């Protein structure tokens, strides 16, 4: 697993101070002490090998600690023999209010 591309993209657009050091986690049964333990989190240096049948929620969190605001966008994917399958059914069209 690799967070570098995610981090580099956000850093290059001025969000280095706002991003987290992980960008998703596995879904399914995990055991104590918590679901936040390694290897479920997606971060640089994680030794987990992604295999068909695994499900991941990949997300981007941007935080503004000064104003106590946060934003999160994410998608759930099933890993398949040929890549991945997006499990969300919502449209990906840009909505401008």
PLM feature spans:
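Active-site cores enriched in adjacent His and Asp/Glu residues with nearby glycine-rich loops
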Residues: 1-33, 49
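Charged, cofactor-coupling segments
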Residues: 22, 29-97
